[in-house]
Amino acid sequence: MTTLLEQRSSANLWHRFGNWITSTENRMYVGWFGVLLIPTALTAAIVFILAFIAAPPVDVDGIREPVSGSLLYGNNIITATVVPTSAAIGLHLYPIWEAASLDEWLYNGGPYQMIVLHFLIAIYAYMGRQWELSYRLGMRPWIPVAFSAPVAAATAVLLIYPIGQGSFSDGMMLGISGTFNFMIVFSPEHNILMHPFHMIGVAGVFGGALFSAMHGSLVTSTLVRETSEVESANTGYKFGQEEETYNIVAAHGYFGRLIFQYASFNNSRSLHFFLAAWPVIGIWFAALGISTMSFNLNGFNFNNSILDHQGRTIDTWADLLNRANLGIEVMHERNAHNFPLDLASGEVQPIALAAPAIAS
């Protein structure tokens, strides 16, 4: 009898827990995906903050030249970053227990891998949580579909690119200047500016920003009610009012006259679908471009210059881009030392500037 009561009690407890996390009446929806999201997001956030502030230098290139990235090791908020896992680790999974000591784990950049993997699981769970809440409320699943664009972009630079290049050391650094460093180095190594998917991605991001600004300004400019001819149109709207007075016909008429008739939408659904689809598709293509370049399927390379009938080079944008790429790549090349650092940085030894005379 006691065993039966305990089983029923535990079953009721689990049932109550399931009802609570899936309830849409809570101030914040948790959901089953939230059970995975919360611990992984907290782990990634806590380790990132600790590493950003106090992580010791990391031997990112695997050549015994540690690179400091934290605030306590000489960086400011702009230059500080979480340095990627060492090239000596490659693509191996490197949890704390795989290292001989905590110092070794930190020296080889273990926190970077820990942050990235937990962060990716967290954003996948967040996307699943968006779908779960939409399902519970009877909504269509377009919100998680739109969120899949930044998820794909993060996956491309933090996971797909290191896999394609053979090491987590090639992943994007987790910091402001580290992000710019990743972008600048990516250009000469893969000629990203000449990749069509990158071009589509740029059009998606900047076009999405333009369309968002246009839409917001049009909506704000048509928040009016019908006024008489002796009243100003501005009297038809009170800031913070509860009722909606947006008039899509007015916005459509204004924009149609500003450009041409068919440049505007007279249907709210098609308008908002376009506003969502344009940047999402663009970012999908950008993520796909990064993923293809991860395996060295790079942008167009015009290695042979255009020559005139006398064999002289006709300089083009491709030549300028090639020279810039070569310059960036040379600056980024890893130093090859002939001596260990403790010998190379020791006291200067006197050397003979002339050969000694040889007695005959």
Swiss-Prot record:
Family annotation (Pfam families): Photo_RC
UniProt remark on cofactor binding: The D1/D2 heterodimer binds P680, chlorophylls that are the primary electron donor of PSII, and subsequent electron acceptors. It shares a non-heme iron and each subunit binds pheophytin, quinone, additional chlorophylls, carotenoids and lipids. D1 provides most of the ligands for the Mn4-Ca-O5 cluster of the oxygen-evolving complex (OEC). There is also a Cl(-1) ion associated with D1 and D2, which is required for oxygen evolution. The PSII complex binds additional chlorophylls, carotenoids and specific lipids.
Protein residues bound to [CaMn4O5] cluster: 170, 189, 332-333, 342, 344
InterPro entries linked to this entry: D1/D2 (IPR055266), Photo_II_D1/D2_sf (IPR036854), Photo_RC_L/M (IPR000484), Photo_RC_L/M_CS (IPR055265), PSII_D1 (IPR005867)
Residues with site note (Tyrosine radical intermediate): 161
Coiled-coil annotated residue ranges, if any: none
Reactions this protein catalyses: 2 a plastoquinone + 4 hnu + 2 H2O = 2 a plastoquinol + O2
Record: residues binding chlorophyll a ChlzD1: 118
Binding-site positions, Fe cation: 215, 272
Residue numbers binding pheophytin a: 126
Domain of life where this protein originates: Bacteria
Family: Belongs to the reaction center PufL/M/PsbA/D family.
PANTHER family for this protein: PHOTOSYSTEM II D2 PROTEIN, PHOTOSYSTEM II PROTEIN D1
Protein task: Photosystem II (PSII) is a light-driven water:plastoquinone oxidoreductase that uses light energy to abstract electrons from H(2)O, generating O(2) and a proton gradient subsequently used for ATP formation. It consists of a core antenna complex that captures photons, and an electron transfer chain that converts photonic excitation into a charge separation. The D1/D2 (PsbA/PsbD) reaction center heterodimer binds P680, the primary electron donor of PSII as well as several subsequent electron acceptors.
Name under which the protein is recorded: Photosystem II protein D1 1
Gene designation: psbA1
